[in-house]
Each structure stands twice: as structure tokens, then as C-alpha cells.
Amino acid sequence: MQFKTFALAATLLAALTAPLAPVAAQVKEHTFKVGIGLSDDHPQAQAVRHFAERLQAKSGGKMNAKLFASGALGNDVSMTSALRGGTLEMTIPDSSTLMSLIKPFGVLNLPLTFNTEAEADALLDGPFGQKLLAMLPDKGLIGLGFWENGFRHVTNSRRAINTAEDLAGLKLRVIQSPLFLDTFNALGTNATPMPFTELYTAMEQKAVDGQENPPATILASKFYEVQKHLVLSRHMYSAWVLLMSKKTWDGLSADEKKIVQEAAREATVFERKTIRAFSETALGELKKAGMQITELPAAEQAKLRTKLQPVLAKYGKEFGEETTSEMMGELAKARGGK
């Protein structure tokens, strides 16, 4: 009886493991370098480590991802270029980095467009977001999903921002993008394009008065050490794009690609959950660190929208009127047709 039980168990084990054998045979050793500009303790970095864990679990330890944080491999622009050239495997730039390569990506950064994280998820995970990702291979990139950066807010070292007019004259670092330049110049600031990796030092040395980023980045990057004032302006929603070099992707087997895609999907869920939890506590931590936080009243938000109408009109056309209209239609659906 014991022998029969053992034989039955062995047969079941063989049946369970047999389907895995062909997959294992098609999975080779891979370690993907992942470069990011943010710090090692930022939620984005935590999500990269989660991605690495899922890769290892799904590949029997054969596939892995190695994180290089704090701009060790360059800024978003240079790392994205490295992916296209095949000298770096992965990076996670702000979607605005891609608009110089593919103009329709710019619609995601149109100011005052998104209201909630939920509608951003619906847009990016739905047909519209997938259509954008499908444009990447022609530029030597593979899009594995959209991660959340969050709603952006303005900080500065000079004064509290209580009205739209209070922004006037501030020298603010912005992402190296014409859209960001025009957005903040329209609001009366002196917009200064600069790589994120240079930002802390620039604020410390008073080369710029301030910057704009989501709370998680402000806290993790310790901007509270060199910035006194934070206004919850919610002027723009910001998404990251999880990218792999097409040259790397093309060198993977079908089984390896499936593992990467599955790990990326799981890491996307993890990243959004992690950064939202982190952001909920970030404002309290920033207050404890000495930052003075203000919120623009609805009337002042309306003033921002009025000032930005020419920017919205200009870039709505530049990024493609059809694309812009499609995005707004999808957002209307996400809002229940409101």
C-alpha cells in the first residue's frame, strides 16, 4: 500500500511538473539593468525590486533585474536614448520624455486634464493607453505598462502661494519639454528646463526658486531641506512608462517575453498601490519636516485654467486633434459620461 501511495504521488508530481519543462528549456539567464533618476527608497525603486522578484519567481531564478537609482546611469533623456541604442535594457521615464519621439504621448501631460487617479488608470490601461504603447517599437522601445508618478504640485523657497498671481516671477525648474516651458511661462513664472538629477543642487544653491513634482518625489528626494513652501496646485497628472529596449526584447524567446510581461503587470499593480499609500502620508511628513502647505481655492484654480487655455489649444493641435479628442472622450466615459 505504501509503495502504491508513493507511486501515485510520483505520478502526480510528474504530471504537474511536465508542462513546466518546455518553458524552462526556453528560459535563459538574463539580468536586465534598470536605470532610474529617483532615489533608492522611492516607491518607483521599490516597484523595480518587486519586478525583479517576480521575474526570478516566474523564471526559476534565471531572469532578474538590477536597479541603478539616483541617476547613476544618466537622466531620463539619456537613459531612454541608451535603450534605443541597446546599451541599457530598461528605464522608467516620465511620459513627457517620449513626446519628442512620439508626439501623441504629449496629451498625457496636458495641464488640468485629469481629476482622479482612477480615471487615469482607466485611460492608461484601456485602449487609448495601449494604442500609445503600440507606437513605441518603431522608435526602438517596448512599453510594458504605465506606472504612476501622481499629481504635480509647486514648491518654492521664497513665498507661500495662495493665489494664481503669487506664482509670478518665481524661477521654477521644469522638465525639459516645450509643453512644460509654455505651461509655466503662461502662469507667469520663469520656467527653467533642467535634468532632475541636477535639481536638488540647483535649489540648494538658489539657482532656481523651486520646482513641481508629486508629494512622493518631494519627500523621497528630501526637497524639504531646500524648499519651504508647497502649494497643492494639482496642475498636471504625471505617468511613468515602464520601458525595455527593443533590441533586448527581440533577443528574448516567446516564453521569456511572457515572463517579462506578467512580471511587469504585477509590478504595475504593486507600484500604483505603493505610491498611493506613500503619497497619503507624504504631506504629513513634509509638514513635520517644516514645509508650509497651502491649497489653492477653486476660484484660483479657475484662474490657472484661464491662463492655460492658449497652451491647451496649442498643444491639443500639436499632439493631434484626433488624439486629444479621443483622450477626452475616454476620460468622459471614465467619469460616467459627465
Model-based region annotation:
Residues Q26-E119, P127-K338:
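N-terminal secretory/targeting leader peptides
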Residues M1-T31, G336-K338:
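Short, low-complexity disordered leader/linker segments with a strong preference
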